[in-house]
Amino acid sequence: MLDASEEGENLRTDEILGLSKLLWLAGNETTTNLISNGVVFLLNHPDVLADLRNDRTLIPDFVEEMLRYDGPVMGLFRTATRNVEFRGKNINKGDTLWLLFSSGNLDADTYEAPETFDLHRRNKDHLALGKGIHFCMGSALARLEAKVAFEWLVDLLPHMKLDFENGKRIPVPILSGWVKLPMSVDVGALEV
């Protein structure tokens, strides 16, 4: 980033800091939240956990459906680049908009039974990783990290207990995940 330039101009310090913060947040926070949301889901849905334990080839499908069903990012802010009317409402150039990916991921016009988690859902498209020029540049790494984590976790989860009463959700409406989620593992029951 220090050497990057466009039309002979280098990035400013504030742009470098902003991009660095984005890379850190997007590359860590979101994958962590995807995995923690998936752990909570699997502990609350032992039938899905059993399916994954019996057929690990379903883990990539599980990751995609988790991204759609309870993704780590609820939405992001965007700035309108021009005046536009949308469904009878005026949006002015410069207005700040909050795009709710999570709402789009539950669109009944796009998904059959959108509020139901479906491990075998045929339409695997979702907005959790953005679209177009705003598509997550770390999406392949995030998917791989989640896949590897769940390949290991499906054997550990039957021996885990979460302490929801002492857990704490992320208090920021943009993100979906946990700040704190205490757990215990019955290590004596684990196969080494």
Question: Where are each of the predicted segments found?
Answer:
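Cytochrome P450
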Residues: 1-192
